[in-house]
Curated annotation (Swiss-Prot):
<dbReference type="GO" id="GO:0030259">
    <property type="term" value="P:lipid glycosylation"/>
</dbReference>
<dbReference type="GO" id="GO:0051301">
    <property type="term" value="P:cell division"/>
</dbReference>
<dbReference type="InterPro" id="IPR006009">
    <property type="entry name" value="GlcNAc_MurG"/>
</dbReference>
<dbReference type="Pfam" id="PF03033">
    <property type="entry name" value="Glyco_transf_28"/>
</dbReference>
<keyword id="KW-0961">Cell wall biogenesis/degradation</keyword>
<dbReference type="InterPro" id="IPR004276">
    <property type="entry name" value="GlycoTrans_28_N"/>
</dbReference>
<keyword id="KW-1003">Cell membrane</keyword>
<keyword id="KW-0132">Cell division</keyword>
<feature type="binding site">
    <location>
        <position position="187"/>
    </location>
    <ligand>
        <name>UDP-N-acetyl-alpha-D-glucosamine</name>
    </ligand>
</feature>
<feature type="binding site">
    <location>
        <position position="288"/>
    </location>
    <ligand>
        <name>UDP-N-acetyl-alpha-D-glucosamine</name>
    </ligand>
</feature>
<comment type="function">
    <text>Cell wall formation. Catalyzes the transfer of a GlcNAc subunit on undecaprenyl-pyrophosphoryl-MurNAc-pentapeptide (lipid intermediate I) to form undecaprenyl-pyrophosphoryl-MurNAc-(pentapeptide)GlcNAc (lipid intermediate II).</text>
</comment>
<keyword id="KW-0808">Transferase</keyword>
<keyword id="KW-0573">Peptidoglycan synthesis</keyword>
<keyword id="KW-0472">Membrane</keyword>
<dbReference type="GO" id="GO:0009252">
    <property type="term" value="P:peptidoglycan biosynthetic process"/>
</dbReference>
<comment type="pathway">
    <text>Cell wall biogenesis; peptidoglycan biosynthesis.</text>
</comment>
<keyword id="KW-0328">Glycosyltransferase</keyword>
Length: 358
């Protein structure tokens, strides 16, 4: 099978696509994979480093722009679809899988024009506008959350789960060692979380000799946050711009402070880790809040709205959970119960089915 994976922008869209590509090549060494993204997305750095073929198209978001901005985007959208048609002509895929992100829409439209079967993978509990509009065009929409089915009443859907990076599904249970706190704001970091965590450090002083903090800051805030840790007397060696081996980071963690992107929640569930979830408030259709509430409803996490994010509140929640081991274990078990394994296999089965190779 020749599979074209379109999308990216953030790790939440990209990493499931990479997991799919890896699984496809494990199943069939003769299969071919082509990624399509943008120069501004995380894929422009990560995919070449990992040796994956990547084509770039010129497209940017327009959902949050005003009327004039949307009108100016029309020529850009037309150009990106044309670029997509050229990529399809060169690669000639059996199926195009849109994984979300700016590059996904033009490639799905181009594939529709070329009558190439399309599949969409929607990671969130409430889909973005692009996937809601393009869903009826796709042969199938694969969902990570069953709650998303209500948004695709005119499309064929299947709940597949979210493909995970290597090592996630084999994550060991939480151990009894000295507690470790994992803090991150997605693949690019999150300034609000970085700042709140930095200011919460003095309030975590009683834990200084017992608690290890691993903090992914993103590149922009790295030096500032490291200096803040040093001033507060906390080790700064584990303050890093990006964590390459997230499976190992989850395995060591007892509690996680993070955003509520769909891929993050799928990884928390697969690894069985309790979390303080701080949804990104400007996500399309506020989908991270919907994601977080779905997790919290099952007892697997606590939701802390960014508007309520203060150093005092964050430190209090961290302390309460670390001091209440039975509750931490219960939340971790609840998270583990939500994990859906084998998502990559299910999505690839759908792709083979729509292009007549199953």
């Amino acid at each position: 099978m020749k599979l074209l994976l379109a999308g990216g922008g953030t790790g939440g869209h990209l990493f499931p696509a990479v997991a799919l590509a890896q699984r496809l090549l494990e199943q069939d060494s003769e299969a071919q994979v082509q990624f399509v993204g943008t120069a501004r997305g995380i894929e422009a750095r990560v995919l070449p480093e990992q040796g994956w073929p990547l084509e770039l198209i010129d497209i940017r978001g327009f959902v949050n722009q005003g009327l004039l901005g949307k009108l100016r985007m029309i020529p850009c959208l037309i150009r990106s679809v044309w670029q997509g048609l050229c990529i399809l002509r060169k690669f000639q895929p059996d199926v195009v899988l849109g994984v979300g992100g700016y590059a996904s829409a033009p490639m799905l439209v181009a594939a529709r024009l070329k009558r190439i079967p399309t599949v969409i993978h929607e990671q969130n509990a409430w889909p973005g506008l692009t996937n809601r509009l393009l869903g009826p065009w796709a042969r199938c929409v694969c969902l990570s959350f069953s709650e998303a089915e209500r948004a695709f009443h005119r499309a064929a859907t299947i709940v597949t789960g979210n493909p995970l990076r290597k090592g996630m599904e084999g994550c060991p249970p939480m151990d009894g060692d000295a507690p470790e706190l994992l803090v991150f704001g997605g693949s690019r970091g999150a300034r609000a979380i970085n700042d709140a965590m930095l200011e919460a450090l003095p309030r975590l002083e009683p834990w200084k000799d017992r608690l290890r903090i691993v903090h992914q800051t993103g590149g922009d805030d790295l030096q500032r946050i490291r200096e803040g840790y040093a001033r507060a007397g906390w080790p700064q060696e584990s303050v890093v711009p990006f964590i390459d081996d997230m499976a190992a980071a989850y395995a060591r963690a007892h509690l996680v402070v993070c955003r509520a992107g769909a891929t993050t929640l799928a990884e928390l569930a697969a690894c069985g880790r309790a979390a303080i979830l701080i949804p990104y408030p400007h996500a399309a259709a506020d989908h991270q809040t919907v994601n977080a509430r779905a997790m919290a409803k099952k007892g697997a996490g606590l939701v802390l709205a960014q508007q309520n994010l203060t150093p005092e509140t964050l430190a209090s929640l961290i302390t309460d959970l670390l001091e209440n081991r039975p509750r931490l274990i219960s939340m971790s078990a609840a998270a583990k119960s939500l994990g859906i394994t084998g998502a990559a296999d299910r999505i690839l089965r759908v792709c083979r089915n729509v292009c007549g190779q199953d």
